[in-house]
Structures are given as structure tokens and as C-alpha cells.
Amino acid sequence: MPKDKGVVKRAIVTPDKHFPLADKKAIGCLTKAIEIVKPDTYVDLGDVGEFHAFSAWRFKRKKKPPLEYIIPRVDKDVEAGIQLLDTIDESLDKANVKIKHMIQGNHDVWPDMFVDQHPYIPQYKFDKACM
């Protein structure tokens, strides 16, 4: 790969958003910054969603209810993550950003752990549900 001597490369890097808990004004600022800066690369450091419904800590001291009671909350969490990523992706598309990196944070691993416990619902794995 040839080196681009003297060429400035721009990247926007974002940390934990924990949607739906994310600050909507901050997300608005991020999307505007993407469209103004027009970075070459976008890097998401993970923890896209709070994913409370997937958390192993949620039922640590109490009995876990049947799966049919958990799934509606899981769906809500996944939808919140998708909405956030769609909002950011829309700005990345407007800025013509082609290089995107996603690092899976600890909260983003929780859906994968949930699927490990319930392998018959693989659609909830993070990379399938939110990407």
C-alpha cells in the first residue's frame, strides 16, 4: 500500500453511546460533525447500546422469567441500537465515508452471550441484530 506523504487523513472516533441512554444533543452534534468534517474513516469504540435486557446482571438475585417475557424487551433494545447506527450511517453516507470500523464493547457482547444461552435465536447476535 503506497504511503500518502503530506496528505492529511481525518477520522472521527466515538466511544460509548449506550443507546437509548445516549444524549440526543450529543448524537446530533456527532452527525453534524461527520457531515462538516467529512472524515476518511469512522471508528466506533463500542457500547452502541445499553442492552439492559441482555444483561446477566439483570437477574443476578432473582429468578429469570421465561424467554417469552424477555424477548419483547430484547427487541426494544435491539431496535434502539439499530436506530442509533442508522442515524450515524446516514451522516456517514452523506459525507461519503467508506472506511468504517466497529469495535465490540462489553455491552455489545451481552447479546452474543444471550445467544450462547439460547442458540435457537441466533438473530440476536450483535453482528446480526445491529449491523
Indicate where each model-derived feature is located:
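Beta-strand-turn-beta hairpins that frame and shape the catalytic cleft
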Residues: 2-11
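Core catalytic region of metal-dependent phosphoesterases/phosphodiesterases
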Residues: 14, 19-131
